[in-house]
C-alpha cells in the first residue's frame, strides 16, 4: 500500500474508489494499491 498525495491509475485494471472520504486505488496487482493521505 502506497500512501501518496496524488493517486493515479498505473494500469488499465486499476480502479479509483472513494471510501469514507479516502481516495483509494484497487487493482489485481497488489503493487498498485494506493491511498491518498
From Swiss-Prot:
According to its UniProt entry, the protein's GO biological process terms are:
translation
Which is a Gene Ontology cellular component entry for this protein?
Answer: ribonucleoprotein complex
Q: Keywords for this entry?
A: Ribonucleoprotein, Ribosomal protein
Tell me the protein family, please: Belongs to the bacterial ribosomal protein bL36 family.
Identify the InterPro entries for this entry: Ribosomal_bL36, Ribosomal_bL36_sp
Protein name, entry field: Large ribosomal subunit protein bL36
Top-level taxonomic group = Bacteria
Q: Which GO terms describe its molecular function?
A: structural constituent of ribosome
- What would be the name of the gene that encodes this protein? rpmJ
Amino acid at each position: 500500500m502506497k500512501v501518496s498525495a496524488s493517486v493515479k491509475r498505473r494500469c488499465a485494471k486499476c480502479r479509483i474508489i472513494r471510501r469514507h472520504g479516502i481516495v483509494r486505488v484497487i487493482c489485481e496487482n497488489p503493487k498498485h494499491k494506493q491511498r491518498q493521505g
